[in-house]
Amino acid sequence: MAKETTKMIYPDFKMELEAAEPVETRPRWGNFFANHWKGCVVFLMPLLCLPIIFMNNTPAYRCMYVLLIMAVFWVTEALPLYVTSMIPIVAFPTMGIMGSEETCMTYFKDTLVMFMGGIMVALAVEYSGLHKRLALRVIQIVGCSPRRLHFGLIMVTMFISMWISNAACTAMMSPIVQAVLEELQSQGVCKIYHEPEYQMVGGKNKKKNEDELPYPTKVTQCYYLGIAYASSLGGCGTIIGTATNLTFKGIYDSAFPNATEKMDFATFMFYSVPSMLVYTVLTYVFLQWHFMGLWRPKSKEAQEVQVGKDNAHVAKKVIDQRYKELGKMSIHEIQVMILFIIMVLMYFTRKPGIFTGWADLLPSKVIKNSMPTIFVVIMCFMLPANYAFLRYCTRRGPVPTAPTSSLITWKFIQTRVPWGLVFLLGGGFALAAGSKQSGMASLIGSSMSGLKVLPNAALLLVVILVAVFMTAFSSNVAVANILVPVLNEMSLALKINPLYLVFPAGLACSMAFHLPVSTPPNALVAGYAHIRSKDMAIAGIGPTIITIITLFIFCQTWAKVIYPSLDTFPEWAQIAAEEAANKTRHLSAVAASKTIEFAANASRLLANNTELVNDLSTGSSNLVSNILANITEPLAQLAANGTHPLTDLAFKN
C-alpha cells in the first residue's frame, strides 16, 4: 500500500529514478584499481621485488630490496611518507642488515636536532610577530608600484625562507598578498579574479559553471606564484632553510666523516646564496614577462600594470596601515631578534677556519650546529615575553595578575612543529647507513663505472636534470634520500670529488615549480588563490630552465672558488673508494664462495642419490638371483631323481 501511495504522490520523483542509469551489481576492474591502487602497490611491490633476494641472498641485495620498496612507496605515496620512512626499523634487523639499536640511532642525529631546533626558533619569530614587521618594512622601502611591489614581496619571501620552513614562509606571506590585492581591487587598480560568465536558463540570467572556483587573473597568479617560487629558492640559501638541505648534508657527512671539505653553515651560504640571488631575480623577470607584460608595452597586462603604477599610492596606503597596526616594536620582538642574530653568529663563528672559532676554545669534543640551535631554543623558554613583573619591585603601575609567558610556549610548538619530518629525515639517514654497511652503495657505485666516458660537466648536467625531474613528482626529501647515497658511491667509482655531484643534486631537489603536489609552497598558493595545475605547469617552465642553467654555471665557476679542490679526487675520497672497493671484493668473494658451496652441495647430493640408485639396482638384481636360485635348485634335484612335480601331478590325476 505504501508503495502504491509513493507512486501516486511522487510520480516525477519515480520517473527520475527510472530514467537514471542503472546501478551495476558487478564491480569493474577500472573502478577497483582507481579506488584501491594504493593497496595493490603496497601488496604487490614486495612480491615483485623478491627475485632480487633470490638472485643473491646477501646483505647488499637485501638492502637493495628494501630500497626499491621504499622508493616506490615514497614516489607513489601508497603509504604516507612518514610511515614509509619507518620501514628500516623493521626491515633492517630482521633481514640482517643492521641491528635495532644501530638503526634507531640514525633517526636522531645532529643534523636532525639542528633542523627541529631551527623550526622552533622560526616559530618563536612567528609567535612574536617579528616576521610581519620585517616583511612590511622592507616593502615600504622597496616601493609600491605593481612591479616594485612584486619584487619586494619576492625578495622578502626569499630572505625569510632562508631561516624558516618554505611552507611556513608561504603561509605567512599569502595573507599579506591577499590584503594588498584586495585594496588594489577596491581602488580599481586591478582585479583578483575574472568576472564569472553568465548564460540564459529558463528566461533567467544565471552563472555558467556555478560549481567551478573563481579563476584568478594573471596579476593574481604572478603575485602568488612569485612568493611560492621565492620560498623554494630562498630555502636553498642556508642549511636550515629546508629539510632537503639537511637531508643531503646529513647523508654526505655520514658517508664521509673524514672529509676535509665540510658543509658547515658559513660555507654552505657562500656556496649557494650567490646563485640563489641570481635565479630569484631571473625568476622575477620571467614572471613579469609572462604575466605582467614586461617588454610588451602594448599588451593588455602591461596596460593594467601602467594603471597600477599611476595608483601606487593606494598600495602604499595599505602597507602603511598594516605596519601602523603593529604598533611599536615590543620587547618580545626585540629579544627574539637578538636571539636569532646570536644563533646566526654562532653558526658563522663556530669553526670558520680563517680564524679561531669559539668551538676551538672549548674542550676537545666535537661541537656541531645543533648546540647553538638548541641553546637559543632553551633561551626562548627562559626569557620572559615582557618584564611587567618588575613592577612588584618598582611599585609603579599596575602589577600583573597572571604569570608572565616566555618568548614561546611549548603548546604552540607542539601544535605547529611537523613532527613527522623526524621520521622522514631519519628514514633517509637509516637507508644511507644501511646501504653503506651492507655494501649496496658500493655495489651500485661500481656498476656505474661505465659513465667514465662522459665528461664531468656532462655528468653533472645529467645529475641536475634527473634530480629536477624526480622532484617534480615526489617529495623533495624523499628524492634526496634516494639520489644522494647513489651519487656518493658513483662519485667514488668514477674518481670524482663527491661534493661535485652531491651539492648541486641536493640543491636541485628543491627546484620544483610545475605542480601543486611538487612542494608545499606550490600547494598552498594553488589552494589559496585557486590556481589551476595547467597554469602552474606552464609558469614553471621558465623558473625550471633558469635554475638548471644558473646552477650548472655556478657549479662550474663559483663552486670552485669555495672548494678549490673540487676538480681533484681528494685523499679522503681515495681512502673511502679503497674501502668501498675492498667491501665490494669481499661481497663478491662471499657471493662466489656461497655459489661454489651451493654447487658442491648440489653435486654431493647428486652423487649420494646416484649411489643410492646404484645400491637399489644392485640389491634388486641380487634379490632376483637369489629367488631364481632357490627355485631352480630344488627343481634340478627333482629332475636328477627322475621325478617332477608337474608329471607327478598329472600321473595322480
Regions found by a protein language model. Name each.
Residues 2-619, 623-630, 634-653:
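Transmembrane helical cores of multi-pass ion-transport proteins
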